[in-house]
């Protein structure tokens, strides 16, 4: 009985510490991208995103994030 109780408490703590909303921003910030402009699509990919970021004064840009919701993000 004590083992089952410890296991249930462990599972509850582990799931309460997980925050799925934090993952996309950590992916973006992990690569140094500061500013996300728009969502990328089949017609708006890296070849359109990078020049847009450079025009706005950033050094680089690309479609990053979690599939299927990639965003055009710019790097300082």
From Swiss-Prot:
Signal peptide positions (record): 1-22
Keyword terms of this UniProt record: Antimicrobial, Disulfide bond, Fungicide, Plant defense, Secreted, Signal
Positions of disulphide bridges: 36-74, 40-63, 49-72, 53-73
GO CC annotations on file: extracellular region
Compartment(s) where it occurs, according to its Swiss-Prot or TrEMBL record: Secreted
Gene Ontology biological-process entries: defense response to fungus; killing of cells of another organism
Database matches in InterPro entries: Defensin-like_dom
Family membership noted in the UniProt record: Belongs to the DEFL family.
Record's protein name: Defensin-like protein 71
Source organism of the structure: Arabidopsis thaliana (Mouse-ear cress)
